[in-house]
């Protein structure tokens, strides 16, 4: 009996990446124009002979060999979960800081599992992705590394699973789709809010017809991050106290919904998006930033004049 199949991770289609754009920016090379107050983005032309991956099925695997990249805040929890999934072998652990990878290694030892190989440094993920004995690369690194790690993984014949937001602009979204189509490798957005008990229950009810013909839906994600700001404030390994943690820096410099798929993903599943229907227009709104400014002012003892998100 096969304990686990690769497709059991990879239920959602790659097209969900098009939803991540709400939080990120249009890259300079993205072609777009205004149409009655709406930003209209041109859809890249699919190369001749290349097919979409909405129905892509990977060959069944007796054992899924996994490499993890990014073991800071979210990555270690993923390693812990995978330790308890039958049919999984954790082959490699990678983080810029070797000590973080070693912490996850210690968890493997406590579970009586075979030690994984450790990779670290700026190019460690490249070495991991080039291995021949990895089927899936699980990416929980900082956001700016989501795309380059996924690109390296797929170019080396690996399926990829990427934390939100997965891409930082529309060009990267389309590039991930193109890479998945060319390599025929799954590229899965780890949108955890699609798979909580409440959302899965609602999806089952929708598919069973409990709500009838769904013609309108609302979704939301409300999460005050104030409890995390201390952790996001400063890189503990940086002696320059003016250098902020990448997560805090991003919120200070960028507006928008950072990961719209938290609220929109479950709704998209209930509406069967990309299974007959698709989104044509997305609307994003925000308020004036005041909570973030107040927090930074109190933390730093200096007035914060610029905090764009929140």
Spans of features found by a protein language model:
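Bacterial N-terminal signal peptides
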Residues: 11-20
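Short, Asp-centered acidic motifs that coordinate Mg2+ and/or phosphate
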Residues: 92, 136, 216
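Predominantly a Rossmann-like dinucleotide-binding segment in NAD(P)-dependent oxidoreductases
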Residues: 183-188, 193-310
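Bacterial N-terminal signal peptides that target proteins for export
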Residues: 2-10
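A structured beta-alpha segment of the ubiquitous adenosine-cofactor-binding alpha/beta core
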Residues: 116-139
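Beta-strand-loop-alpha-helix segment that lines the small-molecule cofactor/substrate pocket
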Residues: 136, 142-143, 147-195, 209
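N-terminal Rossmann-like dinucleotide-binding module
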Residues: 26-111, 267
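Boundary at the C-terminal end of the N-terminal hydrophobic targeting segment
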Residues: 21-25
């Amino acid at each position: 009996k096969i304990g686990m199949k690769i497709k059991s991770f990879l239920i959602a289609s790659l097209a969900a990446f098009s939803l991540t754009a709400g939080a990120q920016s249009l890259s300079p090379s993205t072609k777009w124009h205004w149409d009655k107050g709406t930003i209209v983005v041109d859809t890249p032309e699919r190369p001749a002979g290349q097919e979409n991956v909405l129905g892509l099925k990977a060959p069944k695997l007796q054992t899924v060999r996994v490499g993890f990249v990014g073991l800071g805040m979210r990555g270690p929890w993923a390693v812990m979960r995978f330790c308890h999934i039958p049919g999984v072998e954790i082959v490699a652990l990678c983080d810029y800081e070797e000590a973080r990878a070693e912490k996850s290694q210690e968890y493997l030892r406590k579970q009586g599992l075979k030690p994984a190989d450790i990779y670290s440094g700026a190019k460690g993920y490249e070495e991991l992705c080039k291995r021949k004995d990895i089927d899936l690369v699980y990416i929980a690194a900082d956001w700016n590394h989501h795309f380059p790690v996924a690109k390296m993984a797929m170019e080396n014949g690996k399926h990829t699973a990427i934390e939100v937001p997965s891409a930082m602009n529309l060009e990267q979204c389309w590039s991930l789709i193109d890479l998945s189509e060319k390599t025929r490798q799954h590229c899965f957005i780890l949108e955890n809010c699609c798979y909580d008990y409440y959302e899965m229950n609602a999806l089952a009810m929708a598919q069973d017809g409990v709500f009838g013909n769904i013609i309108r839906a609302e979704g939301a994600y409300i999460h005050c991050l104030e409890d995390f700001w201390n952790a996001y404030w400063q890189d503990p390994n940086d002696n320059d106290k003016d250098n902020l943690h990448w997560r805090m820096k991003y919120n200070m410099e960028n507006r928008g919904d950072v990961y719209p798929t938290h609220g929109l993903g479950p709704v998209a599943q209930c509406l069967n998006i990309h299974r007959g229907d698709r989104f044509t227009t997305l609307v994003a709104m925000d308020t004036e930033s005041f909570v973030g400014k107040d927090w930074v002012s109190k933390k730093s003892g200096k007035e914060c004049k610029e905090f764009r998100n929140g």
